[in-house]
Amino acid sequence: MIEVEQLSKSYGPREAIKDLSFQIEKGEVVGFLGPNGAGKSTTMNILSCIMPASSGSVKICGFDVFEQALEIRKIIGYLPETPPLYSDMVVYDYLSFAARLRNVPLKNTQSAVEQVIEKCSLKEVSERIIGRLSKGYQQRVGIAQAMIHNPDILILDEPTIGLDPIQIIEIRKLIQELALSHTIILSSHILPEITQICKRVIIISDGQIAAVDSLEALTTRLRKGERLVLNVRRNSSEILEKLRTLKKVNAVT
C-alpha cells in the first residue's frame, strides 16, 4: 500500500532524513518512533504531499507522491503536529469547510460531517467555537478534518502532544477505534504511545532508520541487548559518530 525507497530530504547542507526505505501494508497500524528532530515530521510531510523530497521514491496505492499528488490526497488524511484549525470558526462549520476543501460532493457534505462528529465524539461541542475548546477537543476536531473525506490512510503526527493524561487516554482510544477501518501511520517520540496503539514500529534516529519490526520482535531484541548510558561533556557529535562505528552497537541516540 505504501512503498518508500531511499527517501532523502536536505535543507541546505543539513540532511533531515537519509535513505529511508520501508513498506506499510493495508490495514496496518505502524508507529514511527524517534526523538524530537529525528526526521519524523519531515517524513510525514513528504508522505502527505506537503513537502518535496530531495531524492528517493514514494508510492501510495500505486500512485507516485511526486507526480500524482492530487490522486494521493484523495486517499490520505493528515493531522500535522499543529492541527490546521481556524480558532474563530464553529466546529460544524469548520468541518463543512474542510469537506469542501477535500472535494466532498455538496449533497454528501452534511452526512460526512455528521459521521466524523459521531466517530470523534464531538456532538456536544459541534456548535461551539474551536478556540474555546480544550486542547483534547481541538485535537479531536483535527482528527475529524483528516478523515472528513473517508480516506483509506490516516497519517497522524504526534497526535497527543501537549495533552493532559486524561486527554491522551481519550485520543488513544479514538485512534484504536479508527484503526479498525483505516491504515494508520502514527509518529511519536513517546514509547508508551507507540506500544499501546501500534503493531509494528519503525524507529528513526538522526534521519536514518535504526530498526523496523513488529512490536513483539523489537521488545525481544531489546531484552537480549544491553543499554549503556554515557554523559558526554564535549565534542558530543564527534563522539556519537565514533560510537556508531563500533561493532555490536545497534543504535546510538
List PLM regions with ranges.
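ABC transporter nucleotide-binding domains
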Residues: 2-4, 9-205, 210-211
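Residue-level recognition of short, structured coil/turn motifs
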Residues: 103, 135, 223-224, 248
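Generic recognition of short, well-ordered alpha-helical interface segments
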Residues: 196, 210-213, 234, 238-241
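Generic secondary-structure microfeatures
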Residues: 198, 205, 222, 232-234
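Short acidic-hydrophobic catalytic motif
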Residues: 216-221
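Short, charged/small-residue-rich alpha-helical element at the C-terminal edge
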Residues: 224-253
